[in-house]
Amino acid sequence: MAPAQSDLQPQSAPKATAAAQAAIGDGLVAEAQAFADELAAWRHDLHQMPELGNSLPQTSAYIQARLTEMEIPFATLVDGSCVVGLVGAGAATAQGNGVCTDEQAGTVIMLRGDMDALPVAEESGEPFASTNGCMHACGHDMHATALLGAARLLKARESELVDANATVKL
C-alpha cells in the first residue's frame, strides 16, 4: 500500500515573518558595514599574495591568523593549503584543533571558497596589485575575504548555533 500524500510532505519549522527576516537581514548588513574597511584590507592583503595550485603557504597562514584573531578553531589539510574553521556546536568541542566528531557537530552547514590564483601577470595598476607574476584574476581573494566576513558574523551568533546543535564549517 502506498503512503498517503500527506505522509510524503516534509515537516518544516515555522517560517519567520517577512518583517522578521528583513530585520535579521538589515542587522547583518549593518554589522558587515561596520567592518567594511577591514574586509577591504583583507581582500587587498590576499590580492597581493597570489599563490598557485595547492601550494598556498602565505595565503593559508593569513587565513589562519585571521581565524585565530576571531578565536575560531581550525584544521589544515592538503599540506596546509586547505583551512577549515568551525563555528557553533562543533567548535565548542574541538578544543582548539578544529576537529570534531559528527555527533559533536550536530547539523552541519558548509561554506567554501577557493584561495589559489592564476599564472597571469597583473597589469591593473592598483596600489594592491600583485607583483609575482600571478594574480587573483578569478576572484579567489574575494572568496576568501567573503568567508572571513561570514566567519566573523557567525562567530557573533555562535551561541545560537550551539543552542540549535549546529556547526558551520568554513
Stretch-by-stretch model annotation:
Residues 2-136, 141, 145-168:
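Acidic/His- and Gly-rich active-site-bordering loop/insert found
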